[in-house]
Amino acid sequence: MQGNERIQDKNEKEKAYAPYLDGASVSTDNGPILSVFALQEIMQKIRQNQSDMAAHAPDVDGAIPEVMTIISGIKGLLEEKDYKVINAPPNSFRTIPMQSTEYVLQVNTFYERMSEIGGPIDETDPIGFYALILEKLKFLKSEGAFILQGIATKDYRGAEIADPEIIGVSFQNALSHLAAIDRQIIQDTLNGMIIENGLVADRNVDVFRAAMSDPIYRIHNVLQGYIEGIQYGELRESVNWLMRLGLRKRIEFANDFLTDFRRADTIWIISQRLPINANVIWNVPRCHIANLITNVALCLPTGEYLMPNPRINSITITQRITQTNPFSIISGLTPTAVQMNDVRKIYLALMFPNQIILDIKPDSSHAVDPVLRMVAGVLGHVMFTYGPIMTNITPTMAELLDRALSDYLLYMYNNRIPINYGPTGQPLDFRIGARNQYDCNAFRADPQTGRGYNGWGVVDVQRVQPSPYDHVQRVIRYCDIDSREIIDPRTYGMNMTYPIFREMLRMLVAAGKDQEAAYLRQMLPFHMIRFARINQIINEDLLSAFSLPDQNFDVVLHNFIQGNFGETDPVVLEVSWASIWFAFVRRFEPIARSDLLEAAPLIEARYAAELSTMQMDVQQLRMMRARVPDTVINATPSQCWKAVLKNAPEPIKNLMNLSHSFSFVNVRDIVRWSQQRDIQESLAYVLNREAWAIANDFEDLMLVDHVYIQRTMLPEPRLDDINEFRRQGFFYTNMIDGAPPIGDVTHYTYAIANLQANMGQFRAAIRRTLDDNGWIQFGGMLRNIKIKFFDSRPPDEILTAMPYVYTEEERDGVRMVAFKYATTATAYFLLYNVAYSNTPDTLITVNPTFTMTKIHMRKKIVRRVRAPDVVSQVNKRLVAYKGKMRLMDVTKCLKTGVQLARPTI
């Protein structure tokens, strides 16, 4: 008993380290496992090629990313909404009380909050500037992308009026400083803000007016218009497309999720649109490997490797006691783990023709078993396709298989089987047979006709009926098998054949290989089931936006043979001779479809929408670079790309860089991608487009290029009449209403400033201009603006701040100077407060205080208004949905396997 236990423990250890050395046991593979396996093999191949190259190539060493984690992250993005539902619009204006009872200061809080976004701009850091722009855009979209529901109202004399909390103006803190008559005027104005009943299509809504900053209102208006379009057309188009996709993929529609969109109390929103514009996904630079791996992980079904009936061997190639033919010699072999990995590669190549192709693994020790090699030469001609449209193997492997088949036919030469050699001496250039000789040239590879392999004599790529995806209209028909046929493993494949298989049987019979011909004849049903399943997987499960477009698919083989480099060059994986035999005696049998298959359309749509948004960002940043060259002096097109990637969601960025392709993206790729016109329409894209339209006016982002230097005395008024001084609400700001006359402005470029600094006259020139009461502008670059309020004298670092940084130092006895124009400008507001005990000269100092910086903006951020006019900004029309209405985002419902109640329009 102890001996048996030791043997059992030893067997368990062997199984732990070599899972494919336990007899007929085989593994189960699914999409995620095969995707990681394929990515590992592809990255290993890339690294090996780079190590063999004489020239230096970018290093791509790094951890292999977890594909399913990335896809789950993109799926998680579907849970994020591009809008928020609130019960009151944000306060866009706040009121600052003054000592005056007639005037108050009203501040546009949007610009105040926008000024706090980001730090100082550095003209030597373009990526930082681009990141600042994108951060401000994100803030703009988050501020304006809201939906109003259940607003606070109250009754007044039989009318429903707006609660002061929802009008967008905060003024309660200033009421105590106002006169009673002004407070009454404000109250009467509030009582007149009646909530009106309106209709959006046939949905009842509340319509009212509120104060709102123009940028926020534009974003909100676009969102509201997107919803008010009701999107019946988009919904109907999406559902019809999903039905077509379900018909193609054989996905039954379930009835467990029914939504009646015609209910009058339901407002529904579609943030993603179907069908997907797959060109957006395939326009990404260096994306073909990432899309291939994603297609594997997203759509490939779970399957297991089944072996044929063992009686086929016993009645054909192993019926004799003495095993002398090659097939019988290797029939009892068990694959190792490495060989099973090669089997995986073979089936990946069969499922992804023209994307993954195979080559024979070189053996540096020259120890290839000749028996395995010759058997692989026979089976390779009925396993693989080599032309005329698609291929599974390289030209080198096709030639090696031809040689192996030639050697097999000449193996164990029998004088009773005459052979007539041809004149060329090439592999298979001979006729074999006694009475009816067979010309073996019919099996020599020819990619133009597919001769010698499965593609000969059949139409294996067809375009029969329109596909749900416009970019993939092809239907793969290995061995001329229709993927729509019902496959019953008990009967399917009987009495079926195809041209190259018939020719193989004829050639084997002519060569006297009757046992091998009988074996292949018995294996034919198993062989046909293999390719029928592969056809089904390719044409149904693997059909997605990540499938290789037809225009690229059709030219892969031609480019590969001619040595032309294309955008989607195939990935070459190496396999051993033995793995061809093990792949032939196993077939991939799907046992369960991918769990992500029903959510795949939405994952594709979200990915494409994010790509379109990123593409728009790159386009706009490149145009911004041309508009403000002084702000980004050393900018390159690649820095726009890097800044956008830095701001992109992490799952999107990881999927784009799935194969470490970012190490190889160049400026040409970036420029070409940014100029593509294909887009994936979505709510996020629409909001981003409007945000960029707003950002065309830099002042809406609190970026200003009109910053000047002029020496001005800080006002020090006499207090002859304190009551009058208080009534006027006296304040001072360094923001000017209009730009100074052009003739009075001295424009300092970098060249002028450096020239004067090198001559040692920079400070003197600046002083002379200021003494003449002149204006100086340093460059035309954008500066971030900060807003501050003071009720006493501002600190000197603000009053004397200059819109440049001038540094001077000695380095190795040489005087060095440097300029930096990228500084943060401060727009300050000084509110004068006085008491009745103050004397007339309380605000006057013996030595005057000077302020240096002046800022010109067309936007009125702070206004002094009369007390009754604090609600004068309430002029924007807003729509709010009633509290009992249902706001439903039906985007997550748009997936295959879920039947929606289609609206009848």
Curated annotation (Swiss-Prot):
It is found in: Virion. Pfam families: Orbi_VP3. It comes from the Viruses. SUPFAM superfamilies: Reovirus inner layer core protein p3. InterPro entries: Inner_layer_core_VP3_Orbivir (IPR002614), Inner_layer_core_VP3_Reovir (IPR016029). GO terms for molecular function: structural molecule activity. The VP3 protein is one of the five proteins (with VP1, VP4, VP6 and VP7) which form the inner capsid of the virus. Belongs to the orbivirus VP3 family. This is Core protein VP3. It comes from African horse sickness virus.
